[in-house]
């Protein structure tokens, strides 16, 4: 069963994403911010297939979190979907430069999120096989 790590400081958003991912057949873990995410990933025996991450969070923002994940050889293959209220083209460019695989703005359609997550997992699997 594919595994997703939901990283957002808003409990209601984590709940919404968790619920829809579980209904779609995913195992779900949660982190409340970027620092919590990195702590979880470093301790995990089994890494998630995909991470959904917000941008604006306390302690460590989403862009810095993505950059840290991409810099770590053990984690750099994980697919990342940014889910945020920031939809300006400059925000999307910063996220893409940091290494996100997909970018969705809030409010988001839960079905589109599930579809996007499945898509980036497929692309991540192809990257992993070719490396």
PLM feature segments, named:
Residues 101:
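Short, glycine/charged-rich "phosphate-handling" switch motifs in NTP-dependent
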Residues 30-50:
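Acidic, metal-coordinating helix/loop segments flanking the phosphotransfer/catalytic sites
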Residues 86-87:
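Short, conserved "switch-loop" micro-motifs in signal-transduction and mechanochemical regulators
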Residues 15-23:
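Charged docking surfaces used in two-component/phosphorelay signaling
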Residues 108-117:
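C-terminal output helix
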Residues 57:
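Receiver (REC) domain active-site loop signature in two-component systems and cognate sites
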């Amino acid at each position: 069963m594919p595994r997703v790590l939901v990283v957002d400081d808003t409990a209601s958003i984590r709940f919404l994403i968790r619920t829809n991912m579980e209904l779609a057949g995913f195992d779900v873990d949660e982190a409340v911010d970027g620092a919590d995410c990195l702590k979880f990933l470093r301790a995990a025996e089994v890494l998630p297939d995909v991470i959904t991450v917000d941008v604006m969070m306390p302690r460590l923002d989403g862009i810095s979190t993505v950059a840290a994940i991409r810099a770590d050889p053990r984690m750099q293959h994980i697919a990342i979907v940014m889910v945020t209220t920031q939809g300006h083209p400059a925000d999307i460019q910063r996220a893409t430069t940091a290494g996100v695989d997909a970018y969705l703005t809030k409010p988001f359609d839960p079905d589109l999120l599930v579809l996007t997550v499945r898509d980036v997992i497929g692309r991540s699997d192809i990257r992993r096989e070719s490396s």
